[in-house]
Amino acid sequence: MRVLVSNDDGVDAPGIQILAEALRRAGHEVMVVAPDRDRSGASNSLTLDVPIRTRRIDAQTCAVAGTPTDCVHLALTGMLDYDPDIVVSGINNSANLGDDVIYSGTVSAAMEGRFLGLPAVAVSLVTQNHEAHHFETAARAAVEIVARLKADPLPADTILNVNVPDLAWADVLGFEVTRLGNRHRSEPCVPQNDPRGRTVYWIGPAGPEQDAGAGTDFHAVRTGHISITPIHVDLTRYQALDTVAGWVGGLTAALDAPA
């Protein structure tokens, strides 16, 4: 298969290099199109106000001065001279569990691939303090998942969000299909003073686990399993349509009121 590989940790990150090499050893044709620096937390942002510069590192690697979504969007809308068969994003050097997917550039790169018509997988290694020990485990999981998708494709609107415990392959207990868990609200932002005495802020840490019981991605990884969560682009909360329709009915009088 022709595999487009991207990430949000940057083109030089060890995770993406190990992933690309594992896919090549498995017989796939791999093209890496990734940010030229760390763009973690970029979510689905596109660069629209300035042109996007690219730099070919070699025949199979392109660095992009943009977001993960920019990378996949450019690759699938004309930058490459061929059409990839699948998008694989990662390997992220930290978890993308629960609410993390809202902010994750790793997941968003996969989401852009799915939005533009390709099967897509986001792969993250659940590390402690970004100290990764077993990227090879996540890479092998990715290779196995890509092979399975080739043999038995999933429905067209499905993105696979994969989180791998930082264990040796022999110590992984299996694959587990999960739903997204939830975290408590984020920790407070962190104010500091710059050298001129002005206040600056750092975004605070992610909140602790809240909904993390059996069946969630948090629980699967914590118990030594590879979590596979099917997600999709459509954010509509269908269960709330009738409730909100009744609620909107209460706004009708506002249309008849004088301005």
Swiss-Prot record:
SUPFAM superfamilies, per database record: SurE-like
Gene source species: Xanthomonas campestris pv. campestris (strain ATCC 33913 / DSM 3586 / NCPPB 528 / LMG 568 / P 25)
Keyword Metal-binding: yes
Highest taxon listed in the record's lineage: Bacteria
Alphabetical UniProt keywords: Cytoplasm, Hydrolase, Metal-binding, Nucleotide-binding
Catalytic activity: a ribonucleoside 5'-phosphate + H2O = a ribonucleoside + phosphate
GO cellular component: cytoplasm
Name the UniProt record assigns to this protein: 5'-nucleotidase SurE
Cofactor(s) this protein requires: a divalent metal cation
UniProt keyword annotation of Oxidoreductase present: no
GO molecular function: 3'-nucleotidase activity; 5'-nucleotidase activity; exopolyphosphatase activity; metal ion binding; nucleotide binding
Chief location of this protein within or outside the cell: cytoplasm
Enzyme Commission (EC) number: 3.1.3.5
Localization per Swiss-Prot or TrEMBL: Cytoplasm
Class of this enzyme: hydrolase
Family from the record: Belongs to the SurE nucleotidase family.
